[in-house]
Structure formats: structure tokens, C-alpha cells
Regions:
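Compositionally biased linear targeting/interaction segments
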Residues: 1-272
């Protein structure tokens, strides 16, 4: 009986030791990931600041999506600069553009997309107590429109903005590939072709396949800058700043950041 009791005690102690060892390993891994995230965030912010400084020196508005390679402290990072008129402006987009967005990107049938697009227009045009149109203050406000649930918003969130006044049209040179697909009526091959021509720096990009009633040109002073910082596990850490390139005497900088976000882009794992 004594021997059996000793064996049970030894087994219990080994289980406790194993659990403690696993807990220590997990905590060490979490600390390592937190340290990597903090370092990647600082590197991404530094790369964005360098690109912003160059944009301020050039004093020339960027009219198309472009990617800048930034070497910093022995790391090579890509910073994507996107003028916000490459997104669908919730406060000025016409009903046909919103309906196309809901159909192509949102996955809704046309019979549901058209009335929902009109509901979005009705929401932003509704008058406040002061008599001004209510308008969308942030893209998240889209979920206040009846019929827009979180799943639909998640499919649209990266394609819309409430931070500019674009006149209702989209600049295809600045548009992400998913927005190009909306402008192309769902033609993914055409959107990819235009995106490839644009990324190659081609001067005259053929836009004839896009719906001419939905596109426009021009420049804005608001941009999304996104730095991609590679991390040791093969993934990337994305640092994003939404900025207004205008002098501000309050802080002395020639730009103002009005939104920031950070996220992890996991490494692609081969399928088993």
C-alpha cells in the first residue's frame, strides 16, 4: 500500500511539473510574440514616417496607388500609398455605384442590393435637428443602416470610406483590386489586368472595360499608408495610418493622422 501511494504521488508530481513546464513555454512564446509585435510596429511606423517626409518634400499629390520600398535598420519594408478616392465614398456615392458594390463585393442579389443602396442614400441625407444632412462619420456607421449586418459590413469595410468628399466617383488608378472588380462589374480578370498595368508604372492604363459612369479622376490630400513588416515566422505585421497631408501649426507636422490600425497577417501554410 505504501508503494502504491508513493507511485501515485510521483505520478501526480510529474503531471504538475509537466503542466508547469508547458505553462512556462506558452508564456515565453507569448512574450516573444509581443516583443516581435512591438518591434514590427515601431519599424512599420518608422517606414511610414519616412515615406510621409518624402511626400511632404515633393509637395506633389499622389494620384495612384503605389508601393515604396523602404530600407530601415537592415530591414526591407514595403509601404503602400493609396489615395482615399480609390475607395467608395459613403457620403457621395450614387445609388448605382452602391448597388454595384453590394452586388459584387457584398454578394447580394440585385433585387436586394438596389433597395439597400437607396436605404444607404436615405440614411446619409436624413436631416439632423440643425437641418444638415446626417452623413456617415465613419465607415462603421454603415451598420446603422437597416439591412446591413456585421457579415455584410466585414465584406465591404476595406472598400469604403467616410473620410473624403470625392464627388461620388472612384479613381481607378488609386482603387484596390477588389474595388476595381466592382467597377468592372465583377470581372476579376479585367481588374487583375488593370492592377498589373498600374503596378508596372505604365503611363496609359486601359480603363475602357470599366463602367465609365462610376469612375473619375483627380487628386485628394488624404491617404492610407500601409507598411508590411516581415516577421520571423513567415507572416507579416501590417501597420496602417490614414493621414491628411496638410500643414498643421498645432503640432508642426505637415500631416495629420486621423486613424491608425495594426494587424497580423499570418504566414500561408501549405495544405496537407
Amino acid at each position: 500500500m505504501v508503494l502504491i501511494a508513493v507511485l501515485w504521488i510521483v505520478m501526480a508530481l510529474s503531471i504538475i511539473v509537466t503542466g508547469l513546464s508547458r505553462s512556462v513555454r506558452d508564456e515565453a512564446k507569448m512574450l516573444s510574440m509581443a516583443r516581435q509585435g512591438a518591434q514590427a510596429s515601431a519599424l512599420g511606423d518608422a517606414a511610414i514616417q519616412l515615406v510621409l517626409q518624402q511626400m511632404a518634400v515633393d509637395a506633389k499629390p499622389v494620384d495612384r496607388m503605389t508601393t515604396v520600398q523602404v530600407p530601415y535598420q537592415g530591414r526591407q519594408m514595403d509601404v503602400q500609398v493609396m489615395p482615399l478616392n480609390g475607395l467608395v465614398d459613403l457620403n457621395s456615392a450614387k445609388t448605382p455605384l452602391l448597388a454595384r458594390l453590394l452586388t459584387v463585393a457584398g454578394g447580394l442579389p440585385e433585387s436586394a442590393a438596389e433597395p439597400l443602396a437607396q436605404a444607404i442614400v436615405d440614411y446619409r441625407e436624413r436631416r439632423t435637428a440643425q437641418g444638415a444632412p446626417r452623413r456617415f462619420e465613419a465607415s462603421e456607421d454603415l451598420m446603422r443602416v437597416p439591412g446591413v449586418n456585421y457579415d455584410l459590413y466585414a465584406r465591404l469595410s476595406g472598400l469604403v470610406t467616410a473620410d473624403i468628399r470625392s464627388g461620388g466617383a472612384v479613381n481607378p488608378l488609386a482603387a484596390p483590386s477588389a474595388v476595381l472588380q466592382v467597377l468592372a462589374g465583377g470581372n476579376a480578370q479585367l481588374a487583375q489586368q488593370i492592377d498589373s498595368q498600374r503596378q508596372s508604372g505604365q503611363a496609359g492604363v486601359d480603363m475602357t472595360g470599366l463602367d465609365a459612369t462610376l469612375i473619375g479622376s483627380g487628386t485628394v490630400r488624404r491617404y492610407r499608408l500601409q507598411a508590411r513588416v516581415p516577421v520571423p515566422d513567415g507572416g507579416s505585421f501590417l501597420v496602417t495610418r490614414y493621414v491628411d497631408i496638410n500643414p498643421r501649426s498645432r503640432d508642426g507636422l505637415p500631416w495629420t493622422t486621423f486613424h491608425m490600425q495594426r494587424e497580423v497577417e499570418p504566414a500561408l501554410r501549405p495544405s496537407p
